[in-house]
From Swiss-Prot:
This is Betaine aldehyde dehydrogenase. It catalyses: betaine aldehyde + NAD(+) + H2O = glycine betaine + NADH + 2 H(+). It comes from Vibrio campbellii (strain ATCC BAA-1116). GO terms for biological process: glycine betaine biosynthetic process from choline. Its EC number is 1.2.1.8.
Length: 486
């Protein structure tokens, strides 16, 4: 079996450690590769490489950087199918998703920031006849990206795109569950002309993350993951006053009013709970349905959910793939059993899929609980699997209060034909990413991130460039210096 490791200084780097771990295919439990665990020597090699790369990259013009990033975009799109197949093997998600979303949307973000790079500028303001000041937006230096396992290559692109466009270098640590596609991205960056050391990949578990957050030469950490780990990352980064942005967990509300287009609302609820087998932080797992359409909604939801195809992720017909690991599958099934023991009603699903040759994989059937209450554990806690909670509401003020009754604040959505109500409600929801009459779209131009325990800072959009630059102010005096001393 192949031994994978790190990507440092423009080349694969087997590393200095003998320790390694194995990554498995979630769909069948078969090993994909052995991967070296980084140690301090590997980390320092990546740091020194990034320093050299940063010196070259930051000295290039923004237009030169843009051309290289656009070349990477072309290569990514050219190799979309190859990268998607590898992503499916590593994550267990359906190929129909990976083929059209994961690489494509990541490449869109790189293209977006490549376009913005030459337009980055400071300000200039005259103060009086002999003085003016100007500002420069300068790169931070070496940035660390710590990725999650649900969208490995997309997250690597989302984090590296603004960092590189602004002139920084990046050391990226993928999740140990999904270590493979970040290496392919690094190779593509190099092929596109990125100077050696500007994008390094270093592999391993939480210990590697701790090395990154503790290292004094890392200027910024961008983390995607669950909220508890985010608190640790932020605490560790505080010792050296690193800039931190993080996109964390959620338990997002979807609010469906009685005038909503019912077919659209059911479709959106399914996408917002079952896409990528439920392993999406922005999923709308608390579905609030107005009492006037509740029964009809439930009937349609049950019928359509039971038509979803669970199967081999490489089969184009498969709509629901495999959960990332046996451990995570066990966690999801445990949450389902806890929900079964509550006063909620199991509408459909609620079990591990074992037929049709799927027993060796981590497959859980799409599951819906109705008649849920706000204080039930499966309603309050992030499950990160294909588990939907449906709750009934009667009026606008009530549902707003209930929707906000959570420590999370990542996403929210409203379905109604009354646009005044749609905007009125959305403006009162405590969430950073909101949709009206749709769910899940995240274009490169739109900043995304959470309120409360769902994160700090934003990814994508113009705003994100402020997280990867620092402002230098320069005051210029044109006359003689008027000293207060003789």
């Amino acid at each position: 079996m192949d031994m994978k490791a790190h990507y440092i200084d423009g080349a694969m780097h087997l590393g200095c450690s003998e320790e390694h771990f194995t990554t498995y295919n979630p769909a069948n439990g078969e090993p994909l590769a052995n991967v070296k665990q980084a140690n301090q020597q590997d980390m320092q090699a990546a740091i020194e490489s990034a320093k050299r790369g940063f010196a070259i990259w930051s000295a290039m013009t923004a237009t030169e950087r843009s051309r290289i990033l656009l070349k990477a975009v072309a290569l990514l799109r050219e190799r979309n199918d190859e990268l998607a197949a590898l992503e499916v093997a590593d994550t267990g998600k359906p190929i129909q998703e990976a083929n059209c979303v994961d690489i494509a949307t990541g490449a869109d973000v790189i293209e977006y920031y490549a376009g913005l790079a030459p337009s980055m500028h400071g300000e200039q303001q005259p103060l009086n006849e002999s003085q003016f000041f100007y500002t420069r937006r300068e790169p931070l230096g070496i940035c660390a990206g710590i990725g999650a396992w649900n969208y490995p290559i997309q997250i690597a692109m989302w984090k590296s795109a603004p960092a590189l466009a602004a002139g920084n270098a990046m050391i990226f640590k993928p999740s140990e569950e999904t270590p493979l596609t970040a290496l392919k991205l690094a190779e593509i960056y190099s092929e596109a002309g990125l100077p050696d050391g500007v994008f390094n990949v270093i592999q391993g578990d939480y210990r590697v993350g701790q090395m990154l957050t503790a290292h004094p030469d890392i200027a910024k950490v961008s983390f995607t993951g669950e909220s508890g780990t985010g608190k640790v990352v932020m605490g560790d980064s505080a010792a050296t006053l690193k800039q931190v942005t993080m996109e964390l967990g959620g338990k997002s509300p979807m609010i469906i009013f009685d005038d909503a287009k019912l077919d659209d609302a059911v479709s959106a609820a399914m996408v917002a709970n079952f896409y990528t087998q439920g392993e999406v932080c922005t999923h709308g797992t608390r579905v609030f349905v107005h009492e006037g359409i509740y029964d009809e909604f439930v009937v349609q939801l049950k019928k359509r959910t039971e038509l979803l195809v669970v199967g081999d992720p490489l089969d184009e017909q498969t709509q629901i793939g495999a959960l990332i690991s046996k451990e995570h599958e066990s966690k999801v099934l445990s949450a389902i059993e806890q929900a079964k023991a509550s006063k909620a009603t199991l509408l459909t699903g609620g079990y591990k899929v074992t037929e049709n040759g799927l027993a060796s994989g981590n497959f859980v059937v799409p599951t819906v609980f109705i008649d849920c209450e706000d204080d039930m554990p499966h309603v309050q806690q992030e499950i990160f699997g294909p588990v939907m909670s449906v709750l009934k509401f009667s009026d606008e003020d009530e549902v707003i209060a209930r929707a906000n009754n959570t420590d999370y604040g990542l996403a929210a959505g409203v379905f109604t034909q009354n646009l005044s109500r749609a905007h009125r409600v959305i403006h009162q929801i405590q969430a950073g990413i909101c949709w009206i009459n749709t769910w899940g779209d995240s274009p490169a131009e739109m900043p995304v991130g959470g309120y409360k325990l769902s994160g700090i800072g934003r990814e994508n959009g113009v705003e994100t460039l402020t997280h990867y630059t620092q402002t230098k102010s320069v005051l210029v005096h044109l006359g003689d210096f008027d000293s207060p001393y003789a």
